Amino acid sequence: MTSRSATATARTSSEARAVARTQTLIKGEHGIGTVRRTTLPGGLRIVTETLPSVRSATFGIWAHVGSRDETPALNGATHYLEHLLFKGTRKRSALDISSAIDAVGGEMNAFTAKEYTCYYARVLDTDLPLAIDVVCDMLTGSLIQEEDVDVERGAILEEIAMTEDDPGDCVHDLFAHTMFGDNALGRPVLGTVDTVNALTADRIRRFYRKHYDPTHLVVAAAGNVDHNKVVRQVRAAFEKSGALKDPAAQPLAPRAGRRTVRAAGRVELIGRKTEQAHVILGMPGLARTDERRWAMGVLNTALGGGMSSRLFQEVREKRGLAYSVYSYTSGFADCGLFGVYAGCRPSQVHDVLKICRDELDHVAEHGLTDDEIGRAVGQLQGSTVLGLEDTGALMNRIGKSELCWGEQMSVDDMLARIASVTPDDVRAVARDVLGRRPSLSVIGPLKDKQASRLHDAVA
């Protein structure tokens, strides 16, 4: 028999869990740049960044699901679902959804990545309640009807065809496959013609129910927003939908993942009749939680992050071998990529690859000059600040930070971390990352003799 005091204690404990928890994560001056987080009963997190001086606001909902979470048979399901959430809810048609935001001059969109999905709307601050209502309705009330699945299949197949027609885009999918193979990280976010054709409404509904629980979601809003008002409206929308049914549920922790990069030295070529050959030479990089990522950012900027970078100067400015040449990094939960892209005439592929490989090897052995590091630090700091000048970028930053790291970092702290990078830090990460044996992906009209020599670039 349960005692009265025990029952009261249990009720008190349950009520305590049901109370929303609010924290100030970054305290801005005079409220400008203040970031707050509220965790609702049911595990839904809401983060906001307040900028009273602007007239706009961006509202988004991030889902802890990407193409990495798909089985081979479900490849493309995350992106397919992203499309379907715009097709109608219990109270809005697809036209109602789009016209609501169009009517106030706003913009609305979504994107799917390998480890997350985001739906967002950018509007005037006075129209923020509308944006919240529409986006929350999409996430909690979508119908995912058979006829919509059939119609949207055609649009997605055209999107796949459009990507295939752009070798400069397609080569990045090829490089992911070169590095990760048939692992989910190596498969295209859009899926393939075969997998998209095989997906059914029932399978997509099951995928939706599994991955769009409130514990898997992060709500983010930035601009001229009132945190408490955003929380009240979001909570009302999710409670009305019945989504917050378990008050004791806790938010999903940031993804841990598992290392999946394949052995180095792989070469993949897709022969295609194009004017240019598109190449990516790269190797395993750093996970997004790796503390060396700040030094890696400086290294990447100096190597191929701008017109003064080594690769741009050597490949384009001095020799005119390519119009587009750059380096980039991609960080996932447990692994990463570093790549160098170039588009060039097929006859000059080997020259371009040799120059790029020589530069990577030289920097791996000798590092960068102090002047290069200083310039890269300044460039990275400036681009970081300039990249956060609109509310959409701010919403992306706080939403992704909450989902992927479970914490927030102020812009000042980010700039300080970049400034703290030393030449020794850069040399160490260059030896580690650039010292690894590279792999190579190529799309273009290479002849047999040219193709047979591609392995020289990764030897």
Swiss-Prot record:
Belongs to the peptidase M16 family. Gene3D superfamilies: Metalloenzyme, LuxS/M16 peptidase-like. The keyword Protease applies. The active site is at E82. This is Uncharacterized zinc protease SCO5738. It comes from Streptomyces coelicolor (strain ATCC BAA-471 / A3(2) / M145). Binds 1 zinc ion per subunit. Zn(2+) binds at H79, H83, E159. Its EC number is 3.4.24.-. GO terms for biological process: proteolysis. InterPro entries: Metalloenz_LuxS/M16 (IPR011249), MPP/UQCRC_Complex (IPR050361), Pept_M16_N (IPR011765), Pept_M16_Zn_BS (IPR001431), Peptidase_M16_C (IPR007863). The keyword Glycosyltransferase does not apply. SUPFAM superfamilies: LuxS/MPP-like metallohydrolase. GO terms for molecular function: metal ion binding; metalloendopeptidase activity. It holds the Pfam family Peptidase_M16_C. Its cofactor is Zn(2+). It is an enzyme of class 3 (hydrolase). Disulfide bonds: none annotated. Keywords: Hydrolase, Metal-binding, Metalloprotease, Protease, Zinc.
